[in-house]
Design a protein with these regions (language model features):
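Generic hydrophobic transmembrane alpha-helix motif, especially the helices
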Residues: 142, 152-192, 198-200
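Short cytoplasmic-facing helical segments at TM-TM junctions of multi-pass membrane proteins
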Residues: 192-241, 262, 266
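Transmembrane alpha-helices
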Residues: 183, 187, 220-253, 280, ...
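Loop-to-helix entry region at the N-terminal start of transmembrane alpha-helices
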Residues: 114, 118-122, 172-194, 231, ...
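Transmembrane-helix boundary motif in ABC transporter permease subunits
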Residues: 125-155
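C-terminal transmembrane helix and the adjacent membrane-cytosol boundary/short C-terminal tail
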Residues: 202, 280-307
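Periplasmic/extracellular loop-to-transmembrane helix junction in inner-membrane transport proteins
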Residues: 27-28, 60-128
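Transmembrane alpha-helical segments of polytopic membrane transport and secretion proteins
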Residues: 1-47, 294-307
Length: 307
């Protein structure tokens, strides 16, 4: 096929940086728009919950007023009832607690910041001890089918036991409530990390191990350069689960042993009949738990690779 004179030649389409980055910008804009819509929807849900809460507490106050009038008619005097706290009362309590979270007026009167510090310290120590034992042991179990079969019955027996069931034995043996709380955190944190580490190590791709064997990589280098990066996402999942369980357990443990911690703060405020402080502490526990999960979620993304 011949081209006639004067026929323009087809131009070669060149990929410019602007053209290559266009899909990326489009995906980024889509993600931002979805994030904005999700944020607006979350705000609407929050306003709806606050509205329901406000209406419910108003009905409670009206019912209490009717009971007061009935009591006066019956000659029993005025009945003083506080009812469930309103959102306005909770806002005032939150402002008061957050304005001075680190006050210390005695053994039974400490700020929520100090109590959170005690709880986070116990969780951190128990979690770190569990990681130091569970991850190396999980490596050994995952790399040796024989050791897996030998230890699996013990793991299956000990794993379902509630961590709080160990508290009486810990208090009797250790005779220190704070260390007993750390021990309970260790017990509840060790199993998810141990099982996930063993699973991740045992399921490393055979072709990667075969390449390391072909290159005559020694066992230590293979463990750190091949197995650990491949199993890291699964290990981090176990650590994330362990942290969530540890934060759940420490609240109940501190209610049992008393002394310090956010769990003790909740129980102490309940004994003082301060329902607003109880609700504030419960919400604080939820926010801290969410932040801990976000941290481990970020770490999990850092070690996760795409095939």
């Amino acid at each position: 096929m011949s081209l006639r004179a004067g026929t323009p030649l087809p131009r070669r389409i060149r990929s410019t940086p602007e053209a290559a980055s266009a899909p990326v910008r489009k995906r980024s804009a889509t993600f931002k728009s979805e994030a904005v819509r999700a944020g607006v929807l979350s705000l609407l849900f929050l306003l709806l919950l606050l509205g329901i809460w406000h209406v419910a507490t108003l009905q409670k106050e009206q019912a209490a007023g009717a009971n007061d009038e009935y009591a006066k008619l019956m000659g029993k005097g005025s009945v003083k009832t506080t009812g469930f706290p309103t959102p306005a009362q909770m806002g005032a309590t939150a402002l008061k607690q957050l304005s001075d979270p680190f006050y210390d007026k005695g053994p039974n009167d400490k700020g929520v910041g100090i109590q959170l510090g005690f709880s986070l310290a116990r969780v951190g120590l128990g979690f770190a001890l569990a990681a130091l034992i569970a991850i190396p042991l999980g490596f050994v179990i995952g790399m040796s089918p024989l050791i897996y079969r030998a230890l699996d019955p013990f793991i299956q027996v000990l794993k379902p036991i509630s961590p709080l069931a160990w508290m009486p034995l810990a208090l009797y043996t250790i005779k220190d409530s704070s260390i007993s709380g750390i021990f309970v955190i260790f017990i509840c944190s060790v199993w998810p990390m141990l099982i996930n580490t063993a699973f991740g190590v045992a399921n490393v791709r055979r072709e990667w191990l075969n390449v390391a064997k072909t290159l005559e990589v020694n066992a230590v280098r293979k463990a750190f350069l091949v197995i650990l990066p491949a199993a890291a996402p699964t290990i981090m999942t176990g650590m994330r689960i362990s942290m969530g369980i540890a934060w759940l357990v420490i609240v109940a443990a501190e209610m049992l042993v008393g002394g310090t911690g956010i769990g003790y703060f909740v129980w102490n405020e309940w004994n003082n009949l301060s329902l607003t402080n109880v609700i504030f502490a419960v919400l604080t526990i939820g926010v801290v738990g969410m932040l801990l999960d976000l941290v481990f979620g970020r770490l999990q993304k850092l070690v996760t690779y795409v095939d």
